[in-house]
From Swiss-Prot:
A single GO BP: alternative respiration
Taxonomic path: Eukaryota, Viridiplantae, Streptophyta, Embryophyta, Tracheophyta
Segments crossing the lipid bilayer: 160-180, 222-242
Transit peptide: 1-47
Chemical reaction(s) catalysed: 2 a ubiquinol + O2 = 2 a ubiquinone + 2 H2O
Pfam families: AOX (PF01786)
Main function: Catalyzes the cyanide-resistant oxidation of ubiquinol and the reduction of molecular oxygen to water, but does not translocate protons and consequently is not linked to oxidative phosphorylation. May increase respiration when the cytochrome respiratory pathway is restricted, or in response to low temperatures.
Protein name: Ubiquinol oxidase 1b, mitochondrial
Gene induction: Induced by drought, cold and salt stresses, heat shock, hydrogen peroxide and methyl viologen.
Disulfide bridge positions per record: none
List of residues binding Fe cation 1: 164, 203, 206, 305
Keywords tagged on the record: Electron transport, Iron, Membrane, Metal-binding, Mitochondrion, Mitochondrion inner membrane, Oxidoreductase, Respiratory chain, Transit peptide, Transmembrane, Transmembrane helix, Transport
Subcellular location, record wording: Mitochondrion inner membrane
Amino acid sequence: MSSRMAGATLLRHLGPRLFAAEPVYSGLAASARGVMPAAARIFPARMASTSSAGADVKEGAAEKLPEPAATAAAAATDPQNKKAVVSYWGIQPPKLVKEDGTEWKWLSFRPWDTYTSDTSIDVTKHHEPKGLPDKLAYWTVRSLAVPRDLFFQRRHASHALLLETVAGVPGMVGGMLLHLRSLRRFEQSGGWIRALLEEAENERMHLMTFLEVMQPRWWERALVLAAQGVFFNAYFVGYLVSPKFAHRFVGYLEEEAVSSYTEYLKDLEAGKIENTPAPAIAIDYWRLPADATLKDVVTVIRADEAHHRDLNHFASDIQQQGMKLKDTPAPIGYH
């Protein structure tokens, strides 16, 4: 009987703590407050006083912050305060205008990146393969042209989209590897890093232009993804093994590009493809007249490809003659 009464008493005391929704530590804290010594009860108040004093010190420091730091602090607390971040870092996007006074709307290139294409270049030039490496490069490109022609046939815009996604790879790979070599060997590059990166950027602008002419379908995007992934890695390895062969290969690849754009122009002149107005991005990039057409755009792009052809054959010739690229000035700005 006595044990039953003791159990009931224990349950009455522990029940609220074991089965209440309120956490146990809050109940224990409430019980502890009743037996807390006077000195201990003062401690929370002292801590609160210290926190308050610290807050006052921080507020005073914030008031004394230099103006840029205060601006950054305001930007951190206000995500929409974009101008404060720009002002703090000292970077202000320039407001550019064209020659006619209208606002420059392109972010990927600036007025000083534009140029007038030299369309007088000979688009019929061809490098006769000499020796096994040249013949291997030539016939590799020719073998790739067969499935390309069967797949695209006369769909020139689709072909151009795929071509430009691949054509922008060699310049980037070559420029990157020459850049790393320059850093690794503590030597100059002869300007070839910049020349090859200019080529890659120019090819990318061709792609941006054709995206204004047509949008790729899902299967074309998948094809581009596969082709670019394979070609980048293959060209990377090829350039490491033999830069001479790699540049010769690209020279022949650019010859095929010139030939493809020549066929494009023939169909435009024959009326098989509508000669639509030129995209605005092409007019600004190549400084074309306001009434330029698609034919004018294809003409300047073909001229660009011919210049890339010459540059890569020239780079291969330099190395074929036993010289190094860094010892021969690169044709920077060769358009």
